[in-house]
């Protein structure tokens, strides 16, 4: 039938190409992970990075709430609020700080260490002053490694697999990203959710699925909870909606989808 869609015939060469592509992505991710996780104790517990040192002090000053969500949202009395622990000049986002603090507490309570899963390492993780910064660096390294993978999917969504692979490969060996991933700061953590926001915006460009908008709002919310200067990312979803042709009741439905994204971001 000349009017029917053409059939896609996959050859053996195409499957080999796909397998090779998958192998290349794995190589890129292994390289990215190695460059980010190697040498995490680069200062030998001397706390040489000023921002990291301040965050470490805050982490040892706050501690997880025991009264559930009620105590968590009780700003005046919450044990997680740095302002209640003498750090009234705290200006960083709380999402990475809380994530690291809870993870460090879990490690301390469980006694878990890297050697328990066969990783030969001299790192001692926990919630103490000389331990929590290493937990924070692990979180930064993990977040930045994931950012490389997300960048691949962005390139693949907007262009093709090759562009995604090149973008991921360049990010994997980017000196600035590797450097930041070795610090317990909010940068690598927030960057992960910024890239996730870009990914879901790119997906929304080709599909008006509400899930993409909800995930964009979630990513935007966590990004802003890490660094408030990531707020302009919200303009991206507006550009996506404005790029669509007006069809029927599109403006109303598009507005509702953006309102959903904004509502989730504000809630987070």
What are these regions (language model features)?
Residues 21-48, 52, 65-83, 169-173, ...:
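Transmembrane signal-anchor helices characteristic of membrane glycosylation enzymes that use polyprenol
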Residues 24-29, 214-215, 219, 234-237, ...:
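Hydrophobic alpha-helical membrane-interfacial segments at the cytosolic entry of transmembrane helices
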Residues 32, 167-172, 179, 199, ...:
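Short helix- or helix-capping micro-motifs
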Residues 47-48, 52-141:
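Interfacial juxtamembrane loops and adjacent helix segments
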Residues 138-158, 196, 200:
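Transmembrane-helix motifs of polytopic, lipid-linked glycan transferases
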Residues 162, 197-215, 223, 242-248:
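Membrane-interface transmembrane helices that cradle and orient dolichyl/undecaprenyl
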Residues 176, 182-190:
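Short acidic/glycine- and proline-prone juxtamembrane loop motifs at membrane-interface regions
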């Amino acid at each position: 039938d000349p009017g029917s869609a053409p059939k896609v015939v996959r050859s053996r060469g195409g499957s080999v190409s796909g397998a090779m592509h998958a192998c290349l992505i794995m190589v890129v991710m292994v390289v990215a992970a190695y460059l980010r996780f190697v040498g995490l104790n680069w200062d030998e517990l001397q706390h040489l990075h000023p921002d990291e040192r301040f965050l470490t002090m805050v982490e040892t000053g706050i501690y997880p709430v025991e009264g559930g969500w009620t105590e968590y949202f009780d700003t005046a009395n919450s044990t997680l609020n740095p302002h209640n622990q003498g750090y009234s000049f705290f200006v960083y986002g709380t999402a990475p700080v809380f994530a690291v603090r809870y993870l460090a507490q879990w490690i301390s309570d469980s006694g878990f260490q890297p050697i328990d899963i066969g990783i030969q390492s001299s790192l001692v993780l926990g919630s103490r002053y000389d331990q929590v910064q290493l937990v924070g660096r692990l979180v930064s390294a993990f977040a930045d490694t994931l950012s490389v993978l997300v960048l691949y999917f962005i390139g693949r969504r907007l262009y093709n697999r090759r562009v995604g692979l090149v973008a991921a490969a360049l990010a994997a060996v980017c000196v600035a990203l590797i450097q930041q991933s070795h610090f317990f700061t909010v940068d690598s953590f927030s960057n992960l959710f910024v890239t996730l926001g870009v990914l879901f915006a790119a997906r929304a460009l080709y599909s008006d699925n509400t899930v993409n908008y909800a995930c964009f709002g979630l990513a935007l919310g966590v990004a802003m909870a890490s660094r408030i200067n990531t707020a302009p990312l919200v303009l991206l979803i507006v550009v996506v909606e404005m790029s669509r042709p007006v069809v029927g009741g599109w403006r109303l439905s598009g507005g509702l989808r953006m309102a959903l994204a904004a509502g989730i971001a504000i809630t987070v």
